[in-house]
A protein has these predicted regions:
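Short glycine-rich, acidic/polar surface loops and turns
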Residues: 246-248, 256-260
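Beta-rich, blade/repeat-based domains predominating
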Residues: 38, 125-129, 190-191, 258-263
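Beta-rich carbohydrate-recognition and catalytic domains
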Residues: 1-33, 42-125, 130-185, 195-251, ...
């Protein structure tokens, strides 16, 4: 099963260390079938590593924290553990979820598998790299849209009661919805947000169904610095899509899945999973990307 490894780069591309042993492994039942898609940010001297844990039935967002990237304390599942019936009940109370949510998340009507309750899959948990107005903020994804949790002073606030109210007002927490052809099936988080003078740069993934199956592309959007629920701009085309042989064919075909970035001067390097088999990198001018986004602001939409 999947584990989280460690490597070290000198500069953006020169690999100088790759550990032979996993950095984070499964210890609990909720992650017994793998730990996937890690993202990492540093907030006030603490590293926050979010990942998707799979127990053979459910895939849910989890958190581990560290001060030194050697010793990690697992905080467990931080997304709601909610069944389809509960999701339906809460969101229907105020008509706050579109019909696509129910098509993607009903698990063919099953409520239990292998003796475990089936929960709504909630993945792609990604923290903003600093507190906003003194509070934590993170993205997560229940198909087909990217949602956002804003204004949590402490992660201990993420209780069942908190999430019950969250789902009662679900529409208020939608960050990005599928909009263009390349993301017409669903969208999901990619890299930790990058702070720029124009707003938070969000590199995410968009998915389109095709005759050859789903195609995963990297996408870009810009949201407000003080209120990240406000979308400023979005590229109407993929930032990059599967083109190379090793992106088109692999464990999962047709996948470019961005999860990390680094900025050197004006160059943004984006690290991504290629066909679920390889780690690859692309680069783009950061200022050029922001300028292109500003040509595609919401007010300029046709």
């Amino acid at each position: 099963y999947s584990t989280i490894g460690y490597c070290k780069l000198q500069g953006p591309l020169n690999l100088v260390q790759r550990n032979t042993e996993p950095l984070i492994i499964a210890e609990f039942d909720y992650e017994s079938h793998g730990l996937e898609d890690p993202r990492i940010v540093k907030i006030e001297e603490i590293y926050y590593v979010t990942y998707t844990a799979f127990d053979g039935v459910n895939a849910l967002g989890c958190l581990a924290v560290s001060k030194d990237l050697i010793h990690f304390e697992k905080k467990g599942i931080i997304v709601p553990t909610i069944t389809y019936a509960q999701f339906n009940q809460f969101t229907n109370a105020k008509n706050s979820a579109n019909s696509k949510y129910f098509r993607y998340n009903q698990h063919n009507g099953m409520v239990e598998q292998d003796g475990k309750k089936i929960f709504i899959w909630d993945k792609n948990v990604i923290f903003f790299p600093r507190k906003i107005n003194g509070k934590f903020c993170f993205m997560h994804r229940i198909k087909p849209e990217i949602q956002i949790i804003v204004a949590v002073t402490s992660l201990t606030e993420l209780t069942a009661a908190f999430y019950n109210n969250y789902f009662m007002n679900f529409n208020d927490h939608i960050l990005l919805s599928p909009k263009y052809d390349h993301e017409s099936s669903y969208v999901g988080g990619g890299c930790p947000p990058i702070e720029t003078p124009k707003g938070w740069l969000i590199i995410y993934h968009g998915v389109k169904d095709s005759i050859d199956g789903y195609i995963y592309s990297a996408c870009a959007a810009l949201v407000d610095l003080d209120n990240p629920q406000i979308e400023i701009a979005r590229l109407p085309y993929p930032l990059f899509s599967p083109k190379k042989d090793w992106e088109l064919e692999g464990e999962v075909n047709n996948v470019c899945f961005p999860t990390g970035t680094v900025v050197f001067k004006d160059t943004l390097y984006i690290y991504y999973g290629a066909a679920d088999e390889k780690i690859a990198c692309v680069s783009v001018s950061l200022s050029g990307l922001i300028n292109e986004l500003m040509l595609n602001t919401k007010k300029n939409d046709n």
